[in-house]
Amino acid sequence: DGESIYINGTAPTCSSCHDRGVAGAPELNAPEDWADRPSSVDELVESTLAGKGAMPAYDGRADREDLVKAIEYMLSTL
């Protein structure tokens, strides 16, 4: 499920930065952190695949379907 992918997915895991806001990563349960981010899952997946700021590109390293599940989980906390 999305939460398990968020915690245990492709390294570096989503949780390693988004749990604590490392390097400007928007945190879970913090809608204000996400205000200037794309709101659609597709846009966030594309951003994740390409990499953004300190976040490395996950293209070729993570399954797109897994990214969708992890991002849907993250958005569900807002």
From Swiss-Prot:
Keywords associated with the record: Electron transport, Heme, Iron, Metal-binding, Transport
Residues where heme c binds: C14, C17, H18, M55
UniProt organism field: Halorhodospira halophila
Molecular function per GO: electron transfer activity; heme binding; iron ion binding
Entry comment on modification after translation: Binds 1 heme c group covalently per subunit.
Keyword flag Transport: yes
Entry-linked Pfam families: Cytochrome_CBB3
InterPro entries: Cyt_c-like_dom, Cyt_c-like_dom_sf, Cyt_CIE
The protein's name: Cytochrome c-551
